[in-house]
Amino acid sequence: MIDGIDSSGDGATELTVHRASEFTIEELVNAYNQTRIDYIVPMPMNARRLNEYVRNYDVRLDYSAVAMLDGQILGLSMLGVRPGRCWSTRLGVLPVKRRHGTGESLMRDNIRMARALGAEYVI
């Protein structure tokens, strides 16, 4: 079992984490909205708002994470970066893919990226 995904040779493949910068803003918006489809209070995003969010909160898409399995985006987590500190933001996993380690994989990746950036604090 790797990241909650059975990779024992029965046809299942391993979850992979990619940089968010590999995706278009539209792909990220779609993934973001799908991860929140079951929220009691809707928080829909569009391309303009996501671009503003990335700019206003110093999100580094080249250090942010997108989890995939068999070509499908399962979740994403963005990494905000300011001098000496980083924080995970906009973490979300598809409702039907939760509780299998995807969120943990995204958080571990954010922590690893923050350390690579020399962050003293990771929030």
Where are these regions (language model features)?
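Terminal substrate-recognition subdomain of acyl/acetyltransferases
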Residues: 1-11
